[in-house]
């Protein structure tokens, strides 16, 4: 019987799931919008909501808890310094999930998970390597 089993396994080991969601949390906080499969988005949402609540409460111990969960100090800094003040008057519901059709290749249901009242300029910021251009004078 499947009583009391709340979370999806997503066909991964526990360590893989934990690492994947840590990376996804960091990516969502960095870009404020990511595209993923619908089940992953549904599993990610409560993790991110709890992290934003930690950020709203503030304090060194809660900052360290967020670092332990996310493993990305720069994004924890953004969480506590930028996102937490933005949502100080909102009681939960910091993210939304929008269905985004089906993926070509395996027909997996896709979704966009994003912060409510997100900063549109944050998407794509510092993503991947940048090619250096040499100026010919």
UniProtKB/Swiss-Prot annotation:
Keyword match Ribosomal protein: yes
UniProt GO cellular component terms: cytosolic large ribosomal subunit
Transmembrane regions: none
Keywords: Ribonucleoprotein, Ribosomal protein
UniProt GO BP: translation
GO molecular function, one term: structural constituent of ribosome
Matching InterPro entries: Ribosomal_bL17, Ribosomal_bL17_CS, Ribosomal_bL17_sf
Record-linked Gene3D superfamilies: Ribosomal protein L17 (3.90.1030.10)
Protein family (similarity comment): Belongs to the bacterial ribosomal protein bL17 family.
Subunit: Part of the 50S ribosomal subunit. Contacts protein L32.
Protein name, entry field: Large ribosomal subunit protein bL17
Lineage of producing organism: Bacteria, Pseudomonadati, Pseudomonadota, Alphaproteobacteria, Hyphomicrobiales
Gene that specifies this protein: rplQ
């Amino acid at each position: 019987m499947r009583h009391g089993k709340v979370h999806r396994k997503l066909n991964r080991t526990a360590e893989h799931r934990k690492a994947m969601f840590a990376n996804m949390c960091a990516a969502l906080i960095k870009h404020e919008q990511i595209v993923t499969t619908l089940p992953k988005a549904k599993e990610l949402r409560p993790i991110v909501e709890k992290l934003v609540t930690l950020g709203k409460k503030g304090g060194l111990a809660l900052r360290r808890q967020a670092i332990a969960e996310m493993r990305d100090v720069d994004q924890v800094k953004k969480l506590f310094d930028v996102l937490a003040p933005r949502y100080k008057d909102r009681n939960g519901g910091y993210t939304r999930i929008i269905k985004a059709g089906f993926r070509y290749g395996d027909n997996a249901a896709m979704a966009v998970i994003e912060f409510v009242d997100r900063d549109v300029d944050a998407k794509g910021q510092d993503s991947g390597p940048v090619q250096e251009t040499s100026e010919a004078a």
